[in-house]
Amino acid sequence: FNEAEHVEQVIAQADVILVEPVMQPDYTKARDERKGETGLTPANYKITRELLTGKAKSDAILLHSLPRMDEIPTDVDITRWSRYWQEAFNGVVMRMALLALVLGAME
């Protein structure tokens, strides 16, 4: 565990990069109703394609619980580091299995 002022200071050491939104939007409102109330991620916490390409280990993985805001740009989605889509899919399967177990559909 490391604490740093800028992700750039520690990303080269990371095997797993877990990103979460700094500010949570009000999901009860449509985007056009929010009028910029979403809050922006400080630049020193954003994970960009350039940062990953220039500093991250080639075998590091990038996780995010989704939905994302501006902390990870969409051009990172197609890089070798992104694993958040698989993470989201696996989360659905795990929740289905837990519900089946709790409701007695399986032993």
Task: Label every model-predicted segment.
Residues 1-76:
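Rossmann-like adenosine-cofactor binding region
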Residues 57-107:
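Adenosine-phosphate binding glycine-rich loop
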